[in-house]
Amino acid sequence: MPSIIVFDFDGVIVDSNEVRMNGFIRLYQNRYPWAIDEYRRYLRLNSGLSRYKKIEYFYENILRIEPELMILTKDAEDYSSIVTSDVIKAPFIDGSIDFIKKNINRFEYAMISSSNQLELIKICMSRDIDKYFTEILGSPIEKNKNIERFIRNKNAIKSEIVYVGDTKYDEIAALNSGISFIGFGQKSEFSQTEKVVNTYAELEKILH
């Protein structure tokens, strides 16, 4: 039985995956309209990657140019400006906050996401949910490194931690870090775990 639950954010706590994807489209649609359809297909298949990797991919694999660091940094900042207010307003995943409040004395909660860390903290504070999480970690540090950092900082026992995420990248990061994983969403997204839930009611059952 785990004593610590590590949550992803987008698609697990808040229904914001579409907001995030549309932010990338808005970032480039005026400058590179001919590239948007291909980029949208890529984004749908890779929602769990950080914005830095998605921006790099756009330049290197779709535009086929080597971008300067200054351009990547500016695009990441512009992307944040586009999406932050919409993510703050996005609805919670049904049952997420009820689950967290109900089980606050049962589990310690942390949040480790591929979203930018400073932006993520700002969003959580604006939504008044930062108080539920002992750690809120994000990019540009990669997710598996943040998981390992969390384990070290807490001196936690790996067998007592479970990560709840909605993408194959969450699954890979958790399992490569030696902690358990529960998929949230479509079973077809995950290749290495049998524990997949679609609702917080199902998550509660699986954790009993």
Where are these regions (language model features)?
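Short beta->alpha linker loops
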Residues: V19, S50, P91, G95, ...
